[in-house]
């Protein structure tokens, strides 16, 4: 916050409202968390503690951040309000570009109850087209496979992206196609991602799917690991282009903005840029959660 004030020349007293890209309304709370509580409680009781911790964190985070900022600034803060996580991603992408209209696609693992959104900005007005709701999430699937390959989910996906260049995407294509289902109107569904927070679930499920033991971090990389990475990258690109083609048909805009953690995948971004679907493509310098703030 101090850096932002210095960069803009504003004082804290000039700010009317602080916006944080996380809005847990009662409806979103019920949709986002209770469905996981009931699913885990009925099917896998031991995982309930993990879900409970996520619920508490999500509800308390905006207040904790505001309290800490006030303490560090040494002043009373303006009102602090949460906005939809994917609206934050969308605004970050749009308001950092040099033109005044664009369609926007956001995709990540999960932000509140959404894992993606499609919409269009004209001036300062936003028209929302489609939301994709967790647990349908190509971002979650990418993290699951990253973990299966012996790396850290939500951290090492870039390594898996690099590994994909050395693999054969056809080897595990049927398995990945069984996990992802394109749907009409710019939607898709991911199968077997609902229980991602249950300890041990992802490893066991992917082991059966690929007929392959999970790699440990100290295990040498083998060709089969590169082939899994290639299949994952290929299905991810397919999902994204499915959504982009819907956007292209729905609007006349030639400008595209992209945001969310999935668009830290530079190989994917390069293919979008070279596809010719849109004349101009803009990705903010930090498309992940840090850029949504």
Language model: regions and residue ranges:
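Short acidic/glycine-rich loops and adjacent helix/strand connectors
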Residues: 1-293
């Amino acid at each position: 916050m101090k850096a932002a004030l210095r960069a803009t020349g504003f004082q804290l007293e000039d700010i009317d409202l602080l916006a944080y890209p996380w809005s847990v309304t009662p409806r979103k709370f019920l949709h986002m968390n209770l469905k996981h509580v009931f699913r885990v409680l009925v099917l896998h009781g031991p995982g309930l503690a993990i879900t409970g911790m996520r619920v508490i964190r999500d509800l308390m985070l905006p207040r904790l951040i505001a309290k800490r900022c006030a303490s560090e600034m040494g002043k009373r803060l303006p009102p602090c309000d949460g906005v939809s996580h994917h609206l934050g991603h969308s605004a970050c992408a749009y308001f950092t570009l040099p033109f005044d209209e664009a369609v926007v696609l956001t995709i990540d693992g999960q932000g509140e109850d959404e894992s993606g959104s499609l919409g269009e900005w004209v001036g300062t007005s936003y028209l929302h087209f489609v939301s994709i709701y967790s647990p349908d999430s190509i971002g979650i699937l990418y993290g699951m496979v990253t973990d299966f390959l012996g790396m850290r989910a939500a951290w090492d996906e870039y390594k898996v992206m690099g590994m994909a260049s050395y693999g054969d995407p056809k080897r595990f294509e049927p398995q990945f196609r069984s996990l992802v289902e394109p749907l009409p109107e710019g939607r898709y569904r991911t199968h077997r991602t609902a229980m991602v927070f249950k300890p041990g679930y992802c490893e066991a499920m992917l082991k059966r799917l690929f007929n392959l033991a999970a790699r440990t971090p100290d295990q040498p990389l083998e060709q089969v690991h590169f082939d899994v990475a290639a299949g994952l990258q290929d299905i991810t690109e397919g999902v994204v282009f499915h959504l982009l083609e819907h956007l292209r048909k729905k609007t006349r805009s030639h400008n595209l903005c992209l945001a969310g953690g999935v668009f830290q995948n530079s190989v994917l971004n390069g293919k979008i840029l070279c596809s010719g679907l849109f004349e101009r493509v803009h990705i903010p310098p930090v498309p992940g959660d840090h850029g949504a703030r």
